[in-house]
């Protein structure tokens, strides 16, 4: 892997997926979706979305499978582009051992607000949670942590794993 010889090399989709899949195994109540492009919700034909798993997400189905924690890592580029910057979303729904309250959290290591596509997803999950009687709070990181252009993937992984490991 390039990053083994070049520590400034960006993590790619496969690197991030490989790490996060290990956490899905370690935490059976955790569902990871991604990494996904920012246009995940866009229709590409025949009623399909760029990322159907996320476009058609149903909180009730996740909860029925015992998945009360959800992590998503997004790239700000569209699926037809090469990739620019990683951001993440964490969602935790009532009934987990770490919290009686639910929350949806957005993370951008530059402290920028979420893109409209992510806001739509967060609102969709919030609405579904409320309908199921599990209201959630939405929290958005506004503090900048990253000042170079090589760490965003690592920050996203750390953000999600901090919740999973009880550090957040």
Question: For each of these PLM feature ranges, what is it?
Answer:
Residues 1-87, 93-104:
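Cysteine protease catalytic domains with a Cys-His-Asp triad
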Residues 12-16, 116, 168:
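General structural signal for secondary-structure boundaries
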Residues 63-167:
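Cysteine protease-like catalytic core of ubiquitin/ubiquitin-like
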């Amino acid at each position: 892997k390039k990053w083994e010889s070049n520590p400034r090399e960006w993590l790619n989709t496969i690197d991030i997926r490989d790490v996060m899949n290990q956490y899905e195994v370690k935490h059976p109540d955790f569902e990871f979706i991604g990494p996904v492009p920012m246009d995940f919700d866009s229709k590409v034909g025949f009623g399909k979305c760029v990322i159907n798993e996320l476009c058609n997400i149903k909180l009730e189905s996740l909860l029925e499978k015992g998945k009360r924690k959800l992590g998503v890592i997004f790239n700000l580029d569209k699926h037809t582009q090469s990739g620019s910057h990683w951001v993440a979303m964490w969602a935790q729904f009532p009934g987990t051992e770490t919290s009686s309250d639910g929350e949806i959290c957005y993370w951008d290591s530059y402290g920028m607000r979420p893109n409209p596509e992510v806001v739509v997803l967060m609102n969709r999950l919030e609405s579904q949670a409320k309908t199921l009687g599990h209201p959630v709070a939405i929290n958005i990181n506004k503090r900048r942590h990253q000042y170079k252009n090589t760490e965003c993937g690592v920050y996203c992984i750390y953000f999600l794993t901090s919740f999973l490991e009880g550090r957040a």
